[in-house]
Amino acid sequence: MAIYFILYTLLTIIFAVSLSLFLSVINARKSRKRAVGFFHPYTNDGGGGERVLWCAVKAIQEENPDLDCVIFTGDHDSSSDSLARRAVDRFGVHLQSPPKVIHLNKRKWIEESTYPHFTMIGQSLGSVYLAWEALRMFTPLYFLDTSGYAFTYPLARIFGCKVVCYTHYPTISLDMISRVRQRNSMYNNDASIAKSNWLSTCKLVYYRAFSWMYGMVGSCTHLAMVNSSWTKSHIEVLWRIPERITRVYPPCDTSGLQAFPLERSSDPPKIISVAQFRPEKAHMLQLEAFSLALEKLDADVPRPKLQFVGSCRNNSDEERLQKLKDRAVELKVDGDVQFYKNAMYRELVELLGNAVAGLHGMIDEHFGISVVEYMAAGAIPIAHNSAGPKMDIVLEEDGQKTGFLAETVEEYAEAILEIVKMNETERLKMAESARKRAARFSEQRFCEDFKTAIRPIFTGPLK
């Protein structure tokens, strides 16, 4: 008798919870607001993704002024006015009006530190919980994900939203699966796993299962904008909705940077590296390459300075930055290396305008906004020979070379030496071609392509 009572109680609870959830969704669908909800939990990361957010807000305000723009963020110190100011101060983007802000309390569910193991699936499922919180508080007509949380798309559709995403890179890529299969150690494939046949097999099964789920949820979007040829090729295979996928190059500050003269001071020549202090950005490789270049430098060639410019998101990034500083001391190049943490936009622009070269070290960087910024400013890029930089950016312009591609410490060092040793005429010619190439990725071009992509969705009927 007792077991029946327990079973009845459990079924009653399940029914009550299900009914409550169902009614919440129904009420939310009925109360949808004429607004675009930007799902961007981190509005202070300072990277290219945040620039896309503010340029997208600006584009929608220009294209659809009758729609409110609402930011779903986990940054509780952010307000409408402070975010509008940040868009100007950090990225030079002027919004027509400050966006509305919805503060989220469950952001810990998408933080990497919450999931020491099975991080991808943990963060992905956590994003669903966070999106549930967001959509219950405010349900917009249009749900626009600018942070790559594809697992939120089915939920947003259940809430009656048109789903649009701007995908910087796939959460899982065919390259990641290939590396696990080949047992290559990397920042996202621990050496202990790569060395073990059993663990590699288990991880391969996990990755394949996740890629199937990722494909299912990704296919729920009404429109997917991707930022590069590399990302487009992967998303088309994973999501299998090629007719709903379009490439929109990300916004780069080319207009302001192109105002700088191409001439540079060679006392000393400055080499810049702009990237968040994240493990995949390969700052250590750049430092090692710079040190090697100095060792090989002829006595009659000006000794360059290396400037690291980036933001720190958390304690892990802070520790990574400190290790970089310590390594500079070990290599005895600390006097030749400068660090700029969380630099404001104006300072970043000034540094770019004085650099002769720019370093980029990330393997399979989906696009590479920093590379475009180097080129626009007149700094010759030295980028990793993969993905976005290789396929879209560091290509010849009118038959003229626009920069260098490298993979190893030695290749980066050789490229640094070649630029430092260049005569002024040769350097100016390459810098001019690089700047011309960068014009293809302007903020204005992004806004035009973004508006063209969303127009059929925003003018079509809501289902």
Curated annotation (Swiss-Prot):
Top-level lineage group: Eukaryota
Subcellular location(s) of the protein: Endoplasmic reticulum membrane
Residues annotated as transmembrane: 7-29
Tissue spec. comment: Expressed in shoots, leaves, sepals, filaments, siliques, stems, roots and guard cells.
Pfam families noted in UniProt: ALG11_N, Glycos_transf_1
Residues in the Cytoplasmic compartment per record: 30-117, 139-366, 388-463
Keywords annotated in UniProt: Endoplasmic reticulum, Glycosyltransferase, Membrane, Transferase, Transmembrane, Transmembrane helix
Intramembrane stretches listed in the entry: 118-138, 367-387
Membrane topology: Single-pass membrane protein
SUPFAM superfamilies: UDP-Glycosyltransferase/glycogen phosphorylase
Gene null: resulting phenotype: Lethality.
EC number: 2.4.1.131
GO molecular function, one term: GDP-Man:Man3GlcNAc2-PP-Dol alpha-1,2-mannosyltransferase activity
Family: Belongs to the glycosyltransferase 4 family.
Function per UniProt: GDP-Man:Man(3)GlcNAc(2)-PP-Dol alpha-1,2-mannosyltransferase that operates in the biosynthetic pathway of dolichol-linked oligosaccharides, the glycan precursors employed in protein asparagine (N)-glycosylation. The assembly of dolichol-linked oligosaccharides begins on the cytosolic side of the endoplasmic reticulum membrane and finishes in its lumen. The sequential addition of sugars to dolichol pyrophosphate produces dolichol-linked oligosaccharides containing fourteen sugars, including two GlcNAcs, nine mannoses and three glucoses.
Anything else known: In the absence of ALG11 activity, no N-glycans are produced and transferred to proteins.
PANTHER family: GDP-MAN:MAN(3)GLCNAC(2)-PP-DOL ALPHA-1,2-MANNOSYLTRANSFERASE
Name of this protein: GDP-Man:Man(3)GlcNAc(2)-PP-Dol alpha-1,2-mannosyltransferase
